Design a protein with these regions (language model features):
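Loop-helix junctions at membrane interfaces
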Residues: 1-143
Length: 143
């Protein structure tokens, strides 16, 4: 028998986390930063919460919906920025999911988030190198 109450609850939690993520993403856009390519990644909090509270698949869903809705709100849907954000966000969620599942005794959520940030940055720089800017000096931006 299908437990519709549990399914409904999960959908509500995912919706709330996506909404929280989009709000944090919007607030992050308003913060003046010293350089255009550096962000704090505060909307990643929702992905971490989804990972801990709901599971890996739901964390990926929250990430995908955050990138999709955020890109529609800011007019970057299907642009290179959208593609980079999508690939970086998904790679970050995957890495955080792996570290949360296999190494929870060794890393706190902050450490897991740092690995996710590193994965995001690395994937974005590699994609920018192969598809946009073909200069090896770009790799000096890696952390």
């Amino acid at each position: 028998m299908i437990d519709t109450t549990q399914d409904t609850r999960k959908i509500v939690y995912i919706s709330l986390l996506v909404a929280m993520s989009v709000v944090l993403h919007t607030l992050e856009q308003m913060i003046p930063l010293p350089s255009p390519w550096i962000k704090f990644g505060i909307s990643n909090i929702a992905t971490l919460l989804a990972l801990v509270l709901l599971g890996f698949k739901e964390a990926i869903i929250v990430t995908l919906l955050r990138v999709l809705i955020g890109s529609i709100l800011f007019g970057t849907f299907l642009s290179p920025t959208f593609m980079l954000s999508l690939m970086g966000g998904v790679s970050s969620a995957i890495v955080m999911g792996v570290f949360y599942k296999f190494f929870p005794r060794y890393f706190s959520l902050i450490g897991i988030s740092l690995f996710g940030a590193y994965a995001h940055t690395t994937v974005v720089i590699i994609l920018v190198y192969y598809f946009i800017i073909h200069h090896k000096e770009l790799f000096y931006l890696l952390p």
